[in-house]
Amino acid sequence: QKKDKKDRFY
């Protein structure tokens, strides 16, 4: 689970 710069979860 990675967190993007815009608070998006993958």
From Swiss-Prot:
Question: What residues bear Pyrrolidone carboxylic acid in this entry?
Answer: 1
Q: In which tissues is it expressed?
A: Expressed by the venom gland.
Keyword set includes Secreted? yes
**For this UniProt entry, what's an example GO CC term?**
extracellular region
- Secreted as a keyword of this entry, yes or no, is yes
Q: Coiled-coil regions in this chain?
A: none
Keywords from the UniProt entry:
Pyrrolidone carboxylic acid, Secreted
The record's subcellular locations are: Secreted
- Give the protein family: Belongs to the tachykinin family.
Task: Tell me what this protein is called.
Answer: Tachykinin-like peptide-VIII
Q: Which organism is it from?
A: Phoneutria nigriventer
Lineage of origin: Eukaryota, Metazoa, Ecdysozoa, Arthropoda, Chelicerata
